[in-house]
Amino acid sequence: MKQLLDFIPLIIFFVLYKTNDIFVATGALIIATAVQVAVTWFLYKKVEKMQLVTFAMVTVFGGLTLFLHDENFIKWKVTIIYAIFSIGLAVSQIMGKPLIKSMLGKEITLPDTVWTRINMAWTGFFAVCAVVNIYVAFTLPLDVWVNFKVFGLLALTLIFTLVTGGYIYHHMPKETDSE
């Protein structure tokens, strides 16, 4: 249910962009993201930091997009969010407390070297997504960017998550039969 909530604002943005324009879609994205945060709080009594960062960025950059009637701000939002995630993961690694381990370490037991590799892989992934978004957003037509934002980045994230899951599975301690 929680993962479904994460996709609702994106779906609303896409549908309203295709049926209206970037400004209607952006306004709806701001509202849908606010509702998403409220519903998450209501259902789980907790909102993840990443979700709050995303909400803040959607509100600020979406608001600038609407107020200045300039689609470039909503395009920058994607890059800035990915950059924040990348920098956050890198800083957590430098401080010796990989954020990925903090998020998943209670459920999954892995050696610290594996957590470090996963944390650095996601650091790189988010950095690459930030750079690719800049390229697509500012060199290709708006329609291409919207499709890339909704489907391309989602597909890349899903694939990278599956690859990470396979890597984690490969490095999980194997249960031994003690009979």
Swiss-Prot record:
Pfam families: IspA. It comes from the Bacteria. The chain crosses the membrane at residues 22-42, 50-70, 80-100, 120-140, 150-170. It is a multi-pass membrane protein. It is found in: Cell inner membrane. One of its GO terms (cellular component) is plasma membrane. Keywords: Cell inner membrane, Cell membrane, Membrane, Transmembrane, Transmembrane helix. Belongs to the YciB family. Plays a role in cell envelope biogenesis, maintenance of cell envelope integrity and membrane homeostasis. This is Inner membrane-spanning protein YciB. The gene is yciB.
